[in-house]
Amino acid sequence: MAKAAKAAGSSARFRQRKISVKQTLAVLKQSDIPDLEEEQQRELQQIETGVEKGEEEEHHLQAAINSSIAQSTGAKVEKIYIPTPDASQVWKEYDRFYSSSFHEPASYIRTSVTVEETSGCLYNMDDEDAEFLKTCKPPISEDDFEEVMHRFEVTISEKQPFVSIDVSNLLSFEEMAQHIEDGIRQVQEDPTSPEYILAQLQSSLGITVNGTKGKNEGKAFLATFKKIGAVIYPHWRARKVERKGQSIVPHLKFEDHEKDDSDPYVCFRRRELRQVRKTRRTDVLSIERLRRMQAEMETAKQLVEMVATREFTRKAALKAEWDVFEDRCAIKTLKRELGIKGEDEDLVAQKKRKVEPKKEEKAEKASTPVRGGKAAGSAASAQAAAAQAAAAGSGSPSVSSTHVPPNVSIPPSKIPNMDLITIAQVVRDKDEAIAKAVREKLRLRADADRDWHNLTNSGYIPYCEYLNAEVSSSGEPPVPQYSSINEMAYFEKHNASHRYTTKSDFNKDLASMVGNKPFADAQVYGAIVGDDGELRLSDATSTSSPVDRVIPRSSFMSMRKRVGRGGRMWMDRRGLQRNTVLKPSSLAKNSLDDTAESEADEVAMERLADRQKYDRETEPTRQMSSYDKDPSQLNGISSDTQSIRFGSMLLSKAYENYREVFQQRQQQLMMLQQQILQQQQQQQMRNRQQSHPPGDPGAGLGGGQGAGGGAGGSRNNSPAPGTNGPQSKMHNAAPMGYNKQGMTPSQHQQYQQMQQQQQQQQQQQQQRKMGVAPMNAASAAAAMAAQPRRSSGSPDGQRFNGLPNGGAMANGVLPNGMSQRMMPGGDMKQKSELAKVDA
Amino acid sequence: MALAEADLPNGKTNGKASGSEETPAPVQKVDMNVAINELRVGCKVHVEKDGEDRVAEILSVQMRRGNLEFYVHYVEFNKRLDERIAATRVDLSQGVIWPEPEKPKKPLSGAAKESSKEKKKNPSKKQKLTDSAATTPGANSEDVMDLDNLQVNGTTQDPDNFNRDEEIEKLRTGGSMTQSSHEVARVRNLQRIVLGNHVIEPWYFSPYPIELTEEDEIYICDFTLCYFGSKKQFERFRSKSTLRHPPGNEIYRDEAVSFFEIDGRKQRTWCRNLCLLSKLFLDHKTLYYDVDPFLFYCMTRRDEKGHHLVGYFSKEKESAEGYNVACILTLPQYQRHGYGRLLIDFSYALSKAEGKTGSPEKPLSDLGLLSYRAYWADTIIELLMEKGKQEMTIEDIASVTAMTTTDVLHTLQTYNMLKYYKGQHIICLTDSVCEKYEKMLKKRRRKVNSELLKWKPPVFTAAQLRFAW
């Protein structure tokens, strides 16, 4: 072997020693490769055989291996067999022991019977027993003898497993017989023993299993045993003693209690448990599984027990019923016999208990068709209605407590005698109680909030007190700007509860606050503008009237642009109402400047009406129902959105406010300078006024349109930018078309004069009061607006479109007796922008 | 036969002398003056065997009917040829070799000469083993094998370093049914068995009840494999027993044979009987542990009396080492009829059905080795010749035949088919191989027809594979 290894090593430089099983190898016949160099081939070497080393060198094996190797190298060698001991003899008695009765089944054999099951009695008598049997009188059959011997052996191994230690202690026949009888009886009576089950099966199915003992066989054996047991016992005892207590039939040596590995006759030891690597997890899992199984078994057991109990109870109930019936029968005959006449109530089976459930069932039945989709009209009857209500309340197939699951039939006697409520009823009651509680809560809330206004919608803007103080101290009626800011100012003045800024205000307004009525119904818009053109709000007394209160809201107006025939543009507005306030008188005043002599004929009225058809932008009838009823709700906006909106508004407005004040101061300084200049100019202008053209270039507006108020506003340099927004929008809102219609150049001149005067007044005022409040500016604007004027759109008006509701309000609050109008299509662009703002 | 003996004269006296030359250390003390009744167990004497003079070791000394008898083991013969000889066959004139003095109290231990030889060899062998382990790390990877050192499982153990406790521990955990021959009684304990209509001489020791060893012949039932020392008992038993076939499921049936699958756990008695019987003919089989972890595949021949057992192989329900056969035996009366090949073929058919490769558990017996080698060679040659493939990997061959790649390589090497040609390994179908194939075609051997196999690989739960009570 060492030589071979060396040889392999020497040729290693020529050839690969290792081979991969995944390497593809060419399969070639030797005849195809004559150039195969034999020298390079491996020297034939010893290959491991898998045979034990000692045996590998055995003579015959080596001979055989060498012969096969020789064969493989082409040598002609006879095949060598390893000699084995003789096995060629035939047993002549074979046929005597094996009968020819086997029939091959067509299908493959499948069986699980064991050797013991097919071998009959496990004791086989030997020659010694045969000798003994010959001497027996009366003769005993071999089968009986074996049976008895087997029973002796089995019994002794059960009762005296260690009899081999001392054979003299062997059980006596009497003891043995007793044990055997007990054993047989026990087996027969034990319903879990396989013998018992087998016997049962055999008797019930009429089959017999070969080589097994049934019940009868046990009895038969007992009879035989009584007959021959005593005869056989001495023989058995002798053999047992001879065997020193070992079983008479020799058996294999199994492992004893002390381990004896050296005894070659000990075989078939029990293998120790293969050490399975255990993890706790599997333990836990299996324990869990076992527990669950146990629980399930318990449940099943309980169920079965309960079913059994129920059935017993039912049986008892039936029995009782039967007894009652029998008793009644007896009473009936008795009554008849004795001639007792009376009420037979006690003889009639009372089914009272069954009545109620039946009614309920009827109700249920009635409810089903209704639920099935029939018109509610069919539910005219009270019962049906109730059923429907019940059905509606439950929302699901109403299962009343009287409903019995179909597969469980409860005897009528078991149904409790009480008023039963449907689930539907219960659910309905519950729902109602909840609704009621909610309503009550809401009512209480409304009560608590009655004196309070939710103004979060129009934003509370805290602003500096000094601005406001001037107004309040001046006693001048505030000019409402109809912005949210104005609102605030108004409320601050008249309802101190909304103002927290200063103590002084609080003290001052305390009295009025106490006297104040809450304005719960401040929803009327139309009331803002009085017929006389005065602002109601300016009247201090009107504050007590809730109707007059103006709480401007967002206009619920929406617009739509569309292109009509011929490319005409249309602006549709929604949310407008007919202007009911429109009066012929005012119309006349307004429109008949040029044609004063003509009478108001119907056509004109119609035209006017038509023209004014869409003039009102806001809905007077629109109810701010959410406002007064539930302050917590604003415009249907969620409270979250509101708080965000409100918060951002507060911030932006506060900043704006501050900036405005700052700017105002600067502007006022500038204005003072300008004023001086203006006064000088005015004097000059007065001198030349007669020859001045109407379109003043200073107005910075289209000359044909005669920019009046707008020009004034812009020329005035917008006294208060904060208030300029609404004002300018007001200008925007004023349709241009009216300028031509309603103004003559002369009027325009007059207007300009008046405007200038107004400006002067205003400037004087401003001079007088250094702290210019928005109110002030507003009042100036209002004063201007009080004059009949036609304003054109001011370019800077749009700058302030961002103020909420400003634009929409502007129209409504114009302090002009003549309502301002918008002409459809007149100022399309600006309106659409307004619409955007509103949206 | 003659040629083989001429080639291998080691068993003869002359040969032995050369053997001692090789290993000069143990001086064999030949005592020329020994009386016949002085011989005792362990002595080596010259015995006349089949007209030849052979050295035999005395394994037991008995007095029978007043005559002195020796039970002897012929050196370099398989144990199955051990026999009881009359004192007259011992040739005392050539002297007696006394057992090793250091082991006088161990009469049943290995032969003195053998063991000393082994000891001399051991160091070099071990050296080689460790060397190969160190220099061929590729041996660890699964698909690369060192052609110079193809290891076969189960044969690396040194018989002299055999540790009893280790061996038993291996048996305990490994589920193997083989055991070192050093640990079982070396004396055959039964004289003759009557099995069916055959009278057979047992080969080896088997732990039948010790009472039966006193009988001249024991009777073994052909169907239940139950054993009886008394003919009367056997007769009674045969009159009652109704079993006519192995007590399991028939999983294969063709015109000649049937195969039955029997679970050792379910048919304990039958399987124990089978093991006792097969132990008579298998040296390395152990009955140390019980039959539970094995399935027994039994081949039977049918006739009008029933299914007669021809051979069987056992198979671990779960083999950690990938063995597809634990023990395999064709009963002696059926040997040399091709049944062994059929058994092997069937074991590979099962492996194919399982989709695994498999190999028989080692060590193999001499007969086992020859049978397997013949089967492997025929299978591979047939595959290569029939398919006419131009190229194949070892793995391909393994997967088609369900043989392990080691066995494939082993076989190719044994038949000198693995050659090195133009810098590459090739499988060379040598002329002798082609010749062999021609012969095979003529022979028309029996084969397992896989279509007749009605079998699904049995699946066992962990609980079923535990071997405790």
Curated annotation (Swiss-Prot), chain A:
InterPro entries the UniProt entry points to: Enhancer_polycomb, Enhancer_polycomb-like_N
Biased composition (Low complexity): 679-690, 747-786
Subcellular location as annotated: Nucleus
Keywords: Cell cycle, DNA damage, DNA repair, Nucleus, Transcription, Transcription regulation
Biased composition (Polar residues): 621-640, 714-730
Gly residues bias locations: 697-713
GO BP annotations, alphabetical order: DNA repair; regulation of transcription by RNA polymerase II
GO CC, any one term: piccolo histone acetyltransferase complex
Record note on quaternary structure: Component of the NuA4 histone acetyltransferase complex.
The protein's name: Enhancer of polycomb-like protein 1
Native organism taxonomy: Eukaryota, Fungi, Dikarya, Ascomycota, Saccharomycotina
UniProtKB/Swiss-Prot annotation, chain B:
Domain (MYST-type HAT) ranges: 185-457
Ranges where the record places region Disordered: 1-26, 98-163
Domain called Tudor-knot: residue spans: 39-92
Site (Important for catalytic activity): 327
Post-translational note: Autoacetylation at Lys-285 is required for proper function.
First-level EC class: transferase
Binding site residues for acetyl-CoA: 326-330, 335-341, 365
Name of the gene: ESA1
Keywords: Acetylation, Activator, Chromatin regulator, Chromosome, DNA damage, DNA repair, Nucleus, Transcription, Transcription regulation, Transferase
InterPro entries per the UniProt record, alphabetical: Acyl_CoA_acyltransferase, Chromo-like_dom_sf, HAT_MYST-type, MYST_HAT, Tudor-knot, WH-like_DNA-bd_sf, Zf-MYST
Active-site positions on this chain: 361
Compositionally biased spans, kind Basic residues: 118-127
List of residues that carry N6-acetyllysine: 285
Subunit structure: Component of the NuA4 histone acetyltransferase complex.
Zn finger limits (C2HC MYST-type): 218-243
Summary of the function given for this chain in its UniProt record: Catalytic component of the NuA4 histone acetyltransferase (HAT) complex which is involved in epigenetic transcriptional activation of selected genes principally by acetylation of nucleosomal histones H4, H3, H2B, H2A and H2A variant H2A.Z. Acetylates histone H4 to form H4K5ac, H4K8ac, H4K12ac and H4K16ac, histone H3 to form H3K14ac, and histone H2A to form H2AK4ac and H2AK7ac. The NuA4 complex is involved in the DNA damage response and is required for chromosome segregation. The NuA4 complex plays a direct role in repair of DNA double-strand breaks (DSBs) through homologous recombination.
Polar residues: bias regions: 11-21, 130-139, 150-160
Catalyzed chemical reaction(s): L-lysyl-[histone] + acetyl-CoA = N(6)-acetyl-L-lysyl-[histone] + CoA + H(+); L-lysyl-[protein] + acetyl-CoA = N(6)-acetyl-L-lysyl-[protein] + CoA + H(+); 2-hydroxyisobutanoyl-CoA + L-lysyl-[protein] = N(6)-(2-hydroxyisobutanoyl)-L-lysyl-[protein] + CoA + H(+); (2E)-butenoyl-CoA + L-lysyl-[protein] = N(6)-(2E)-butenoyl-L-lysyl-[protein] + CoA + H(+)
A molecular function (GO) term: transcription coregulator activity
Name the UniProt record assigns to this protein: Histone acetyltransferase ESA1
An annotated GO BP: DNA repair
Stored CDD domains: NAT_SF
EC number(s) stated in the UniProt entry for this protein: 2.3.1.48, 2.3.1.-
Similarity field: Belongs to the MYST (SAS/MOZ) family.
Record-linked Pfam families: MOZ_SAS, Tudor-knot, zf-MYST
Location in the cell: Nucleus; Chromosome
